[in-house]
């Protein structure tokens, strides 16, 4: 438990900024965190790159903060209150509320000052297609906000989650178009997007008992399982997985 506490305390002390924006990467050699994109001096960890500003993705900020909330709740059950952890969780949640668009969406990435980053717009796409790509990760914070609303009993976090869920129902579930779940590209359909949609809407259903959220979760789930059991993702020639005849089914 002590070792786990030290790891979590390190994350809280060094990776969460005053405005709620979150680092998800840390360079142990330099002794400093670094941005997921836009930091020329940092290790390049992904083929997608953006040089105009430093920032992080909505997904890679939300995932560790949900873990932090779960850790807080686990320790609380053991009779140990980690108030600094909860304060950090709330700071990020308030960052989300502040950055949520009027239509209920969030952008896929944000600069360190909290400005939305549009890194993959395409000239051959319509305005609607580019806008949908910019907001393709909207469902991702919903589980986190539902969990926090349940923890604190504060309606504002549930209302924010519902706004995001309603946006997702109208712009993604309605068209059965689940894209932008990975960091690769906001306009690529992927299994993570349908998985997050399923999980986020199901959490909303559990919190509200509104049937439209359960129906949306089921719709996303039907596409998600095809990635696990039917769809055999192609492998690029020259890749070691291709040479071994690797299959993604099952």
Label for each model-derived stretch:
Residues 1-250:
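Glycan-recognition and catalytic cores of secretory/periplasmic carbohydrate-active enzymes
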